[in-house]
Regions:
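Cleavable N-terminal signal peptides of Sec/SRP-targeted secreted and luminal proteins
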Residues: 7-26
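N-terminal secretory signal peptides that target proteins for export/translocation
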Residues: 1-5
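C-terminal accessory segments of proteins
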Residues: 27-710, 733-779
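Long, low-complexity Q/N-rich tracts
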Residues: 712-734
Length: 779
């Protein structure tokens, strides 16, 4: 009889083995689900905690501005300098790749924009902080110090003031995002909480190469409608990035607006019916992208201090400081002018620009660039300077520095204001940028070279090194012996109603249509008189599918910027009215357009021998042209008050490794013959007005810590004045009065010293959020 005992035992073993496998798989599956549930619960707790704390910070007379952050186990809050719960703000095209986050971003913007105009955390009120309607916000005392907006453009606080401004925008928008999540059924909310947990508002990098065949201005910003997922399913809504609407009419408190008080924001508008021309806007940005790239790269290579590189204010930054000839603020102005357009769109006017959604994408990018620059010059920060025009929170002539309260932005519900020292680290507001994740010079330097270094794009041997859309030369890396050339522009910020733009060309064009223009290109602009008297009529042309744009609105063949000879646009951003709110002196700014890439192209094609000054100067004298266009059409450069142009150059010191940047720092050599026969191009020496000159550094310390002024009539018992006749402070000086050499024409009183302003704080503070019940966040 056969013995089956061994096979039976074997079958038992096999069965047991498979049972064990099943059990192990089930256990693993269960553990996986358990871990997943734990992760989901943690994310739910995080998002709900953020919403809870942001809502608490909105209670009381003052909003505690924190950006997108909550509290954790540390008492000072978890959005501190160590980066707890800080996440990157992404470029808009990168954010779009995450469908759920993109959906939440749009729905949050829609909810945010639709909030009541009386809601201080609604879009209308937060946009209104910047300029019009010139009203109080967040408990700021009324009446305002002056009938003006709060934004310090053309001032040393430009960069640091906009950081908490963006933070309160992001905070209010994120609150709207959390409200949107709660609209979804409970069984769908976890999906959206997961998306929201790392979501921050995006930026639009207008200087990066968008890639072959891609537009500089993404259609994400230009499409009139967009498809989103709501609780009821897939729906089409008005794109919240396309425009903002005030409703049926512009509120009276706005005091008027472009295009006959048009009740929605416009970009490069045309009439009949009144509408945006986003196709032309994209065409202009395509043509100026290389210039924007070069300006950004040159700024990072300028080695200026952060305070000088971030403001266009001339007295602080250039002639008096000996620094370079451009600033992030000057670059920023060109984006405003190009997006709004000389036909009078909202971005074209400083006091209404913040209502266009593109403003926030643009300013977030400016904050990004200035944040990156902090790692290039880590030992410098806000520069000292004077308020050069009446503002909502300050009088003209007041001296300011890094301890100045950034009104109206409060860090507690008790009304304590942020200072520039408080906002130096972006992570206190819960964000950073992809290029600053390591907080290192080398990371930023590599990113700058990759994104903005001329000629860094890889070309095939058969490729021409030119822009496929405009024919402009793309550039090559800077080499030993090269010179960097710029068109240096000095301008009066508020010389006229609206803004104005300088367009520069190098080459030979056709016949000019304007006898006072230096550019041989016809004027293709629309006179802005139409911007204030448009009469809507039925559309004359069919709309392009999906965008709301009229096909005939933009013809690239008639756009003078679509030329291989086009260098770029330099913008002077003004307000709806000339004069800068009754400023006593012209508000003079300075910046530049790099000419180097275009000159490299002329050398590449054999039109220019070299980039040495002796070859470039006569070439530009013959072949460089520029035209200036304002809201009323083309302008004669020689008639614009305080407008001057010059060509300057500096010898390049190439980068020594991939972790370094080249040196394009000052001094710059003047090439006078390049412009002396052109309008506004004669040699010019800047003479500072009294308000342009910052007080000596010693003047910014608190009384009693040393002589405050430049002779021994200043100070109040200090221990050492540093100027004049070398006095030792002295007890006979007036408290708060400058020495006799400080310019004073009697137009304003002696300046208020920074430390005399209520809320001044010179130290770098720890952010501590305090609620109305007196408890600190996290207790």
């Amino acid at each position: 009889m056969a013995n089956f005992s061994k096979p039976a035992n074997m079958m038992t073993m096999i069965f047991s083995f498979f049972a064990l496998l099943q059990f192990t798989a089930a256990l693993g599956h269960g553990n996986h689900h358990h871990a997943r549930r734990n992760a989901d619960a943690a994310i739910q707790e995080q998002v709900e905690e953020v919403a809870h704390h942001l809502n608490k910070r909105a209670i009381g007379p003052f909003v505690a501005i924190s950006g997108v952050c909550s509290t954790g186990t540390v008492w000072w809050g978890d959005c501190d300098s160590n980066g707890r719960q800080s996440y990157p703000r992404l470029e808009i095209r990168q954010l779009r790749q995450n469908g759920d986050q993109w959906n939440l971003y749009l729905l949050g913007m829609e909810r945010f924009m639709n909030k009541d105009k009386g809601d201080r955390l609604g879009y209308y009120q937060i946009a209104g902080i910047h300029g019009r309607p010139f009203v109080s916000w967040n408990g700021f005392p009324t009446p305002l110090v002056n009938q003006a907006g709060f934004c310090p453009h053309g001032q040393t606080l430009f960069g640091s003031w906009h950081r908490p401004y963006l933070a309160i925008f992001e905070q209010a928008w994120y609150l709207a995002v959390t409200e949107v999540i709660n609209d979804f059924p409970e069984n769908q909310r976890q999906r959206w909480r997961n998306a929201a947990s790392t979501l921050r508002m995006p930026y639009w990098d207008w200087a990066q190469d968008p890639g072959a065949g891609q537009p500089t201005v993404p259609t994400l910003i230009r499409d009139q409608q967009v498809s989103v997922t709501k609780p009821q399913g897939q729906v089409t809504i008005a794109n919240p990035l396309y425009s903002y609407s005030w409703g049926n009419s512009l509120p009276n408190e706005m005091g008027g607006g472009p295009w006959n008080n048009n009740p929605f924001t416009l970009r490069r508008p045309v009439a009949n019916p009144t509408r945006s021309n986003n196709n032309e806007m994209n065409g202009r940005f395509d043509a100026m992208r290389i210039s924007l790239r070069d300006r950004v790269f040159a700024l990072f290579s300028s080695k200026q201090s952060w305070g000088y590189a971030t403001t266009a204010q001339i007295g602080v930054r250039t002639d008096l400081s000996g620094s370079g000839v451009d600033s992030f603020e000057s670059v920023h102005d060109a984006i405003h002018n190009t997006a709004g357009g000389d036909s009078g769109g909202h971005m074209y006017f400083l006091d209404v620009s913040s209502f266009d959604p593109i403003f926030w994408l643009h300013h977030t990018n400016v904050d990004r660039l200035m944040n990156m620059y902090q790692y290039i010059v880590p030992d410098s920060w806000v520069a000292n300077g004077n308020i050069n025009r009446p503002m909502a929170q300050w009088n003209e002539g007041e001296a300011k520095n890094g301890g100045t309260p950034l009104k109206p932005f409060t860090k507690s519900t008790y009304g304590d204001y942020f200072s520039s020292g408080d906002v130096r680290e972006s992570r206190v507001f819960g964000y950073y940028y992809p290029e600053t994740s390591d907080r290192s010079y080398s990371q930023v330097a590599q990113a700058v070279t990759r994104l903005y270094g001329g000629g860094s794009r890889t070309l095939n041997k058969r490729d021409e090194p030119v822009n496929e859309k405009t024919g402009q030369y793309l550039g090559r890396p800077l080499e030993e012996g090269d010179y960097h050339h710029v068109l240096d522009i000095t301008a009066d910020k508020y010389a006229m109603d609206g803004s104005y733009t300088v367009h520069c060309f190098i080459g030979n064009g056709g016949n000019t249509t304007h006898s006072n223009s230096t550019a041989p290109y016809g004027n293709s602009t629309t006179p802005a008189s139409s911007a204030y008297s448009s009469t809507p009529t039925p559309p004359a042309s069919p709309y392009k599918n999906g965008t709301g744009e009229v096909l005939e609105d933009y013809d690239p063949s008639k756009d003078f910027t679509q030329s291989p000879d086009y260098v770029g646009a330099y913008g002077i951003l003004g307000g709806m009215k000339a004069g800068g709110g009754n400023a006593s002196y012209p508000v003079i700014t300075r910046g530049s357009l790099p000419l180097t890439t275009c000159l490299q192209g002329k050398q590449y094609y054999g039109e220019l021998k070299s980039l040495k000054p002796e070859d470039v100067e006569p070439y530009l004298q013959k072949n460089m042209y520029y035209k200036v266009i304002g809201v009323n059409g083309e302008l004669d450069p020689s008639t614009i008050p305080n407008f001057h142009v010059a060509v300057r150059c500096t010898k390049v010191k190439p980068a020594t490794s991939e972790y370094e940047l080249p040196d394009l720092s000052a001094p710059y050599e003047l090439l006078p013959k390049a412009t002396e026969n052109k309008p506004a191009g004669k040699p010019f020496t800047y003479t500072p007005s009294p308000i342009d000159i910052p007080l000596p550094d010693a003047s910014y310390g608190e009384n009693g810590n040393g002589g405050h002024y430049d002779n021994n009539n200043g100070g109040n018992g200090g221990n050492g004045g540093n100027g004049g006749n070398g006095g030792n402070g002295g007890n006979n000086g007036g408290n708060g009065k400058p020495g006799t050499s400080y310019p004073n024409t009697g137009v304003f009183p002696y300046p208020t010293l920074p430390w005399q302003e209520q809320g001044y704080c010179a130290s770098v503070q720890t952010i501590k959020y305090v609620y109305p019940d007196g408890k600190a966040a996290g207790y």
